[in-house]
Structure formats: structure tokens, C-alpha cells
A protein has these predicted regions:
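C-terminal transmembrane helical hairpin of 12-TM major facilitator-type secondary transporters
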Residues: 119-165
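Juxtamembrane intracellular "pre-TM" segments in multi-pass secondary transporters
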Residues: 28-61
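Helix-loop-helix hairpin linking two adjacent transmembrane segments in secondary transporters
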Residues: 1-28
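Helix-to-loop junctions at the C-terminal end of transmembrane segments
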Residues: 105-117, 204
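A late C-terminal transmembrane helix in Major Facilitator Superfamily
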Residues: 175-208
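Extracytoplasmic gate region of multi-pass secondary transporters
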Residues: 54-96
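Multi-pass alpha-helical transporter architecture, strongest
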Residues: 22-24, 209, 218-242
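Residue-level signature of mid-helix packing/kink "hotspots" within the transmembrane helices
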Residues: 99-107, 194
């Protein structure tokens, strides 16, 4: 609130430059790379991914997770300001608390994923995230403290479920094809984020008073779409070489 709207973009650019500089000092990981003349063509690579049921399921799982994730996120700020009564200054605390707690909970979820199976941790976290999502999006009147608590829990569990999910999805492809797989997965997730935002915008209605209506239905949509992954995750298998 103390700087212009361009400040976050300058910050991201600066952090990106630092990451690029740091990447120059990372060791090379080339053991899995085949000779250049043996590498498949892009079209053949896409076809092999599609023909591999395991990779196809992993890509579908990532798609549905992001569809559910991003249908609600773009509307948190306007919903909190217009419906709950947050000031612009108080909006800062949503992301401060949500991001702050995630810094501590993400490593915890990572350790749980390593200690127990990724599937079990994913199933528990996604079910908790469903409850939090429905509670948050169905708020009508709430104190600032309650709304901040639900927002923080939303950030913790919605982002936390991605940790075991990533483990499940990346293990579905062998080391030699993982880079290509991750590129396709990232592209599909960007597309899913755009579609989810569009769908959320079509469901939500702005009342003459300025309040947003039907955000609760967006929450239901998010839960139903994300719920598909509960049926996909158990079918994923660890690819040879992992």
C-alpha cells in the first residue's frame, strides 16, 4: 500500500534475475540425457506421452487440480472487500498470513510425504482443503479475525496438497522424459488457470450494491473439479527408473 502498483512486478523481475544468476552455479545433471541424434522429435514426444496411460493420467490430474485451484483464487480479494468488509490495508494481511504460514507448513507436508505415502498425504490434505474452500466461499458475514483464519487455512491446505500431488505426478514419468513432461504439464496448467478464472467469472454476479453473489457456487465447482483427482491419484504408477 506504500508503493505503486508496478512495485510487485519490479520485485518479481529482480528475484528472477537473482534466480538466473544462482542457476549459473548449479551443477549439470546430464546423466539421463540421450544422444542428440537419438532424441525423439517434438511430435513423436507428444504422441509418446499421450500413448502412455500413466503420463496421460498425471497430466489430467494436474489439469483438474489447477482448474479447482484457480477458480476461487482471483476473487478472494474482491469478495473480502465487497462482501466481508476488508479495507485495502487489511487485504495485505490475507497474503502476509497465508504466505507466512505456508513457509512453515510446506516443509512439514514435504516431510509427511516422505515419511508416509504421497497418496495418503494427498488424500488427507485435499479433503481438508475441500472443507476450508466451502467454508471460505460461503461466508456471508464474518469478523475480520475469522475471515483471516479461513483465508490462512485455505492458503495452507490448497497449496499444501500440491506437494504430494507433484510427487505423484513427477514419479509417473522416468528421468529421461521428465523435462519434456514438466514442460507440457506447465503449459496445460497455465491453460487450466485461464479457463478456471473464466468459469469463475461467469458464475459470479456483481449486485447493484457492489457485492459479489454466487461465490459459494464457485467453491462447489472447485471442490467437484478437484475431487476428480481423488479417483485419478490411486491409478498413478511409479515409472521405471524412479
Amino acid at each position: 500500500n506504500q508503493f505503486s502498483w508496478e512495485t510487485p512486478f519490479y520485485l518479481l523481475s529482480g528475484l528472477g534475475a537473482l534466480c538466473f544468476f544462482a542457476a549459473c552455479f548449479l551443477p549439470d545433471f546430464k546423466g539421463h540425457i540421450v544422444e542428440k541424434n537419438l532424441q525423439p522429435k517434438p511430435v513423436a514426444l507428444l504422441r509418446s506421452m499421450w500413448d502412455d496411460k500413466n503420463q496421460r493420467l498425471a497430466l489430467t490430474m494436474g489439469l483438474f487440480l489447477i482448474l479447482g485451484h484457480f477458480s476461487t483464487i482471483p476473487f478472494i480479494t474482491p469478495f473480502m472487500t465487497r462482501n466481508i468488509g476488508f479495507s485495502q490495508e487489511q487485504i495485505t494481511y490475507i497474503y502476509l498470513l497465508g504466505g507466512g504460514f505456508t513457509v512453515f507448513t510446506s516443509p512439514l507436508f514435504g516431510r509427511l510425504t516422505d515419511r508416509f505415502s504421497a497418496l495418503k498425504v494427498f488424500q488427507v490434505l485435499i479433503l481438508i482443503s475441500f472443507a476450508v474452500t466451502l467454508l471460505l466461499t460461503s461466508l456471508e458475514t464474518a469478523s475480520i479475525a475469522l475471515a483471516l483464519t479461513l483465508n490462512t487455512l485455505f492458503f495452507v491446505f490448497v497449496s499444501g496438497r500440491m506437494i504430494p500431488a507433484q510427487t505423484l505426478m513427477t514419479s509417473a514419468v522416468g528421468p529421461s522424459g521428465r523435462g519434456s513432461f514438466m514442460s507440457i504439464k506447465s503449459s496445460m496448467q497455465q491453460l487450466a488457470a485461464a479457463i478456471a478464472s473464466l468459469v469463475g467469472g461467469l458464475i459470479i454476479v456483481e449486485l447493484p450494491s457492489g457485492e459479489l453473489e454466487n461465490y459459494g457456487w464457485v467453491g462447489v465447482f472447485a471442490v467437484l473439479i478437484s475431487g476428480v483427482t481423488l479417483f485419478i491419484a490411486p491409478k498413478l504408477k511409479v515409472a521405471p527408473g524412479n
